[in-house]
């Protein structure tokens, strides 16, 4: 089990309160931590959690990505991906908003969409914290992806300049972090 699974099992043993309504958090945590869902206990928790997603932030992400088929793959490549991107690449304020969205705090934000051909004069809209955070998380993930591409180009340049193209196994040691941003590699 991952940390989220251990915490869940601990709480089940410590309280008589019903905790099944937290299984969506457990399932997504197990998937994000790349736990083996073929393990009976992990698989059970993931299956039960994905059948009943209650977290409003998770629901907003799934709605935004238009995901009707909720599987470990769709969670891993969409939901977990933008949450992880925000945690690694977001500002402290963005991470705090992410936490508030995850725990279900209620707050509203004004948002004015960009002008477009179809909507040359967009009106200010009110969005929930969860909707607001989905938009922010997607933006942060795009910035992270852009930075990742820059790092790959720097590594490719390094490989070329150091005549490493023919190496079957290649390790780049970047102690000074000139090539790869630590927010990308973890």
Regions found by a protein language model. Name each.
Residues 7-17:
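A charged, well-structured terminal subsegment
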Residues 15-186:
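Hydrophobic helix-and-loop "lid/oligomerization" segment in the mid-to-C-terminal part
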């Amino acid at each position: 089990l991952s940390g989220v699974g251990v915490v869940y099992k601990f709480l089940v043993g410590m309280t008589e309160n019903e905790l099944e309504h937290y299984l969506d958090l457990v399932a997504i945590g197990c998937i994000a931590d790349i736990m083996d869902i073929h393990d009976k206990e992990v698989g059970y928790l993931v299956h039960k959690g994905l059948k009943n997603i209650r977290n409003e932030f998770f629901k907003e992400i799934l709605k935004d990505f238009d995901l009707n088929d909720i599987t470990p793959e769709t969670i891993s490549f969409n939901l977990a991906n933008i949450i992880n991107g925000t945690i690694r690449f977001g500002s402290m304020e963005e991470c705090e908003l992410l936490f508030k969205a995850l725990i279900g705090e209620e707050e509203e934000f004004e948002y004015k969409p960009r002008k477009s051909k179809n909507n040359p004069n967009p009106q200010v809209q009110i969005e929930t914290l969860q909707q607001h955070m989905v938009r922010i998380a997607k933006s942060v993930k795009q910035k992270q992806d852009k930075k990742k591409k820059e790092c790959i180009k720097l590594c490719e340049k390094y490989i070329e300049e150091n005549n490493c193209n023919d190496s079957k196994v290649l390790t780049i040691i970047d102690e000074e972090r000139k090539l790869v941003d630590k927010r990308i590699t973890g």
